[in-house]
Swiss-Prot record:
Keywords: ATP-binding, Chaperone, Nucleotide-binding. It comes from the Archaea. It holds the Pfam family Cpn60_TCP1. Belongs to the TCP-1 chaperonin family. InterPro entries: Chaperone_TCP-1 (IPR017998), Chaperonin_TCP-1_CS (IPR002194), Cpn60/GroEL/TCP-1 (IPR002423), GroEL-like_apical_dom_sf (IPR027409), GROEL-like_equatorial_sf (IPR027413), TCP-1-like_intermed_sf (IPR027410), TCP-1_chaperonin (IPR053374), thermosome_alpha (IPR054827). GO terms for molecular function: ATP binding; ATP hydrolysis activity; ATP-dependent protein folding chaperone; unfolded protein binding. The gene is thsC. It comes from Saccharolobus solfataricus (strain ATCC 35092 / DSM 1617 / JCM 11322 / P2). This is Thermosome subunit gamma.
Length: 535
């Protein structure tokens, strides 16, 4: 080995590696478990002068700068879950940590890692089948169900009053319905069509939904109108000015009148473009590129409102909101590419001015979030994104399960029944999987301020008597017989993703029995440069 690896390389093998990796996972588990559930505590993330206070799992893991490869694997797993379903990031790290914690007990009993891995995989497959049997199919058009799902998602957030929470829930649902596409009985919610604008100043209760797009730009000329109604809209990806050629040229001018002639030609070129825009009946011109002063003046003179240097993402949203196609050149522009807006006006938001482009048929909308400072508006944005994702998941897979740990406890109960049919030591892994799910429920009760042992024994008893939806009512710190009655529901898609990802991460870590840490490359000494001042 001394001749095989570079000097200074460190190598660990066997159970020592597995147990070390499990220890790392348990540290992450301890860090995140207090943030689990609606009553989970916040974390303060400090980076330089930036401070973030949140209990949002995705934000916490994205801001973690971990060094150990096992920790990195778990963090990447959480990020993947966030990308796939937009929720469950805390849950997946906690559950993976619990699965590894239970696996450690089996390893100490001399159970081989391969047996544990195979048992966990079989338990996962059983869990996914059981989930489908437990879940209830719903209609995505049932607003009450959608309301309850969003309520569950947002109940763990910072909203101060029930009135504020209800207002935000309805805002989220209305925004989702506005951009929802329905084709052949299926639904598609593209969250990218919902723009969130954060404004410092005002109360959170003043947040509002705009049927259209709000752009942080003002008209390019002060003589342009500040408000127009029922107008044609043109979107462009070209500048409104005389463009420079790719070939460098010099003009030889011998007479001052030649300068005037050149400027007149430039004005005539731009005027021709503005005249075409006017002839098409355009009253709002928006481009991703520049608009020169001559064009701005001429458009203002003709009562046309114009915006320049608008972000590509906003241009695409405006296309969805107004129905306008994005013209790539003035030559290709025609009336059939124009869109419509019911109202276009400049408004003040906080200390800045924004342009509101509204339409009754908008397929892209804007949610304006107001709050006293950046921390509040940033956390609100994260909360709304979670809510939008919960609706998207429900549309993709219209099944729900009871929340508050009810589904995890029911799975644990049924897995133990299935474990009796498993032959050999894999039965122990089956039961360990069930124990991890129950431990998850125990943590949920603990973050709600309950005694975890008492809570677990009570919820276990209720499920044993057939109350499959019994769970933890965190608002009153009690075990309730039917969480569906309390409007506490979760999306089946999120639960499936959390189970899959947590199990995959745990089994991947259990498969590692050799870790080789290469020694850092030795830096070659730099040759000393002669001092020119010495002889």
């Amino acid at each position: 080995m001394a001749y095989l690896l570079r000097e200074g390389t460190q190598r660990s093998t066997g159970n020592e590696v597995i147990l070390n990796n499990i220890a790392v996972a348990k540290i992450l588990l301890e860090m995140l478990k207090s943030s689990l559930g609606p009553k989970g505590l916040d974390k303060m993330l400090v980076e330089g002068q930036d401070v973030t206070i949140t209990n949002d799992g995705a934000t916490i893991v994205k801001n973690m700068e971990v060094q150990h490869p096992t920790a990195k694997l778990l963090i990447e797993t959480a990020k993947t879950v966030d990308t796939e379903v937009g929720d469950g990031t805390t849950s997946v790290v906690v559950l993976a940590g619990l699965l590894l914690e239970k696996a450690e007990d089996l390893l100490n009993q001399k159970i081989h890692p391969t047996v544990i891995i195979e048992g966990y995989r079989k338990a996962l497959n059983s869990s996914l089948e059981l989930l489908k049997n437990i879940a209830d199919k719903i209609s995505p058009e049932d607003r009450k169900i959608v309301h309850d799902l969003v309520y569950t998602t947002l109940s763990s957030k910072f909203f101060s009053t029930e009135h504020t929470l209800e207002k935000i829930i309805n805002l989220v649902i209305d925004a989702s319905l506005a951009v929802l596409d329905k084709r052949d009985g299926s639904y598609d919610l593209d969250i990218k069509n919902i723009k969130i604008v954060k404004v410092n100043g005002g109360e959170f209760d003043d947040s509002e939904l705009i049927n259209g797009i709000v752009v942080d730009k003002e008209p390019t000329n002060e003589n342009m109108p500040k408000r127009v109604e029922n107008v044609k809209v043109m979107l462009a990806d070209f500048p409104l000015k005389l463009e420079k050629t790719e070939i460098s040229m010099k003009l030889g001018i011998s007479d001052p009148t030649q300068i005037k002639g050149y400027l007149d030609e430039q004005t005539a070129y731009v005027k021709q473009m503005v005249d075409k825009i006017k002839a098409m009946g355009v009253k709002l011109f928006i481009t991703q590129k520049d608009i020169d002063e001559i064009a701005s003046y001429l458009m203002g003179k003709n009562g046309i409102m114009a915006l320049k240097n608008v972000k590509r993402s906003d241009i695409e949203l405006l296309s969805r909101a107004t129905g306008a196609k994005i013209a790539s050149s003035m030559k290709d522009a025609n009336e059939s590419d124009l869109g419509e807006a019911k109202l276009v006006e400049v408004r003040n938001l906080g200390k800045n001015k924004y342009l509101f482009i509204q339409s009754d048929k908008a397929k892209a909308v804007t949610v304006i979030i107001k709050g006293s400072n950046n921390m509040i508006t940033d956390e609100a944005e994260r909360s709304l994104n979670d809510a939008f994702n919960s609706i998207r998941n429900l549309l993709l897979e219209p099944y729900i399960v009871a929340g508050g740990g009810a589904v995890e406890e029911e799975l644990a109960k049924r897995l133990r029944d299935d474990a009796r049919k498993v032959i050999g030591k894999e039965q122990l892994a089956f039961n360990a999987f069930a124990d991890a799910l129950e431990e998850y429920v125990s943590i949920l009760s603990e973050t709600a301020g309950m005694d975890p042992i008492s809570a677990l024994t009570e919820i276990r008893h209720k499920h044993a008597t057939g109350l499959k939806n019994a769970g933890i009512d965190v608002t009153k710190a009690r075990i309730y017989d039917n969480m569906l009655e309390l409007r506490v529901i979760d999306s089946l898609k999120v639960k499936e993703q959390v189970l899959k990802s947590a199990t995959e991460a745990a089994t991947a870590i259990l498969k590692i029995d050799d870790m080789i840490a290469a020694a850092p490359a030795k830096q070659q000494p730099q040759p000393q440069q002669p001092n020119p001042y010495l002889g």
